[in-house]
């Protein structure tokens, strides 16, 4: 229980809101172990990405050559999360 009117504290960085996430489009170059993918963005930068939880839950398969939407955080622009596979 909190004492002296102190609020609960959190560890690490505060959670990101949707406004803090950078969304970009790219193409999957190759599959890597542990559900990781190498993705090349439209601006020719290469990223290491993992699948979002909803895509994993719905068994959405991602293959090399697929167009995807990638979410990046401003803290680490070398890693991302694949949030959508375009048809």
From Swiss-Prot:
UniProt entry keywords in alphabetical sequence: Cytoplasm, Initiation factor, Protein biosynthesis, RNA-binding, rRNA-binding
SUPFAM superfamilies reported for this sequence: Nucleic acid-binding proteins
Every S1-like domain range: 16-87
GO cellular component, one term: cytosol
Transmembrane stretches, start-end: none
Compartment annotation: Cytoplasm
GO molecular function: ribosome binding; rRNA binding; translation initiation factor activity
Keyword rRNA-binding: yes
InterPro entries: NA-bd_OB-fold, RNA-binding_domain_S1_IF1, S1_domain, TIF_IF1
Primary location: cytoplasm
One Pfam family, short name: eIF-1a
Function, as annotated: One of the essential components for the initiation of protein synthesis. Stabilizes the binding of IF-2 and IF-3 on the 30S subunit to which N-formylmethionyl-tRNA(fMet) subsequently binds. Helps modulate mRNA selection, yielding the 30S pre-initiation complex (PIC). Upon addition of the 50S ribosomal subunit IF-1, IF-2 and IF-3 are released leaving the mature 70S translation initiation complex.
NCBIfam families in UniProt: infA
Record's subunit section: Component of the 30S ribosomal translation pre-initiation complex which assembles on the 30S ribosome in the order IF-2 and IF-3, IF-1 and N-formylmethionyl-tRNA(fMet); mRNA recruitment can occur at any time during PIC assembly.
Similarity remark: Belongs to the IF-1 family.
Name this polypeptide is given: Translation initiation factor IF-1
Organism: Magnetococcus marinus (strain ATCC BAA-1437 / JCM 17883 / MC-1)
Organismal lineage: Bacteria, Pseudomonadati, Pseudomonadota, Alphaproteobacteria, Magnetococcales
Gene designation: infA
């Amino acid at each position: 229980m909190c004492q002296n009117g102190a609020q609960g504290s959190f560890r690490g960085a505060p959670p990101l809101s949707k406004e803090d996430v950078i969304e970009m489009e790219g193409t999957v170059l190759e599959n890597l172990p542990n559900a990781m993918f190498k993705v090349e963005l439209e601006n020719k930068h290469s990223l290491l990405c993992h699948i979002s939880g909803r895509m994993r839950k719905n068994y959405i398969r991602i293959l090399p050559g697929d167009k995807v939407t990638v979410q990046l955080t401003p803290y680490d622009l070398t890693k991302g999360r694949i949030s959508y596979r375009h048809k």
